[in-house]
């Protein structure tokens, strides 16, 4: 049996420890974990398979242009666009058997956009530090 390829999506600049722990758990369980950094401003202090620059490129822009938008919501929406395009490409090419996203309010919102763009039936898990936020309407959850 081939090891499942799990895409781990998170803001590596703020959740590096959590992402590293999740990668270790997945690898120990026999899966291949690929990390996609969906952060905008900070550099990832860990090795990632898909950088924030790769994500921006998948959205047809650059990370610098996203950061220059000057609006967190616009930046996260553009990042979500790139992350969704890249994740979908990985799924369609057989390089993603499931996705686990983790983060706080903004990363959870972004993860919901990404997971909704992926095929029905693909396992998707969102781990969030928030159970409720006025920034995330209940119908999004």
Predicted regions and their residues:
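N-terminal phosphate-binding or glycine-rich loops at protein starts, especially the Walker A/P-loop
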Residues: 2-42, 98, 108-117, 121-128
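Short, glycine/acidic-enriched capping/hinge loops at junctions between secondary-structure elements
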Residues: 18-21, 45-48, 137
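Short C-terminal domain-edge/linker segments immediately following a structured domain
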Residues: 37-40, 64-68, 130-132
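Phosphate/nucleotide-donor binding subsite
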Residues: 46-95
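Active-site histidine-anchored catalytic micro-motif
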Residues: 75-78, 82-84, 93-102, 106-141
């Amino acid at each position: 049996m081939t090891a499942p390829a799990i895409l781990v999506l998170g803001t590596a600049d703020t959740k590096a420890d959590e992402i590293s722990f999740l990668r270790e758990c997945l690898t120990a369980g026999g899966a291949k974990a690929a990390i996609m950094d969906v952060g905008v401003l900070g550099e990832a202090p860990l090795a990632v398979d898909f950088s924030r620059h790769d994500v921006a490129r998948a959205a047809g822009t650059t990370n610098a242009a996203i950061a220059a938008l000057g609006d967190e919501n616009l930046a996260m929406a553009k990042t979500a666009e790139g992350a969704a395009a890249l994740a979908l490409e990985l799924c369609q090419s057989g390089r993603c058997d499931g996705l686990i996203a983790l983060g706080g309010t903004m990363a959870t919102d972004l993860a919901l956009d990404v997971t909704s763009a992926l095929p029905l039936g693909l396992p998707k898990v969102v781990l969030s530090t928030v159970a409720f936020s006025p920034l995330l309407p209940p119908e999004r959850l």
